[in-house]
């Protein structure tokens, strides 16, 4: 990538979010209410090769959001800021993104339909959690990065190139949207409908915390009962060899 391309991605992805947030805050601070939903990504926690500009912009968004949230808490403001971290989505992005890959670009599987992201964003707007992770793959990437970042380096160095391409050579002369929007309505879905998932069990659990807590308690009780019974059985065997 050229330096001006890095600048453009940063201006659109990071500064675009910052300027939009500042505009919303001007109204929300006056009323002392409102929810700002930042659209993040698993890449805000773990960068991958071939997307360094985008990953850096998403991580900058996360840093900006954390600072802003703390400032609002300090002000005792009732304006809340949440960030929804998304997995790979089946959007038209991969048909218009500037790419120098030898084959056509694709999102790193598993791929989800954009409706899954929409459900998460609406829920975050209504409930304003600090963060909301969408998809087990997002949770896995964030957790593994925290526990074993070096392992992630090695894994991505081996797998991330092929994971971001699919069959068919890329057309180096096709139009892209780096410097200007493309004409026409391209819809919300990309070309991966046959592979994309239209639901996320992980998101359902994340947005139904009472059910998750109840299941965890039930599992703990069951484990305790099993352990107690096993202990009594072992005691009987010792007492009556």
Q: Where would I find each of the regions flagged by the language model?
A:
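Active-site helix of classical SDR
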Residues: 21, 57
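Residue(s) in the substrate-gating loop at a strand-loop-helix junction
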Residues: 41
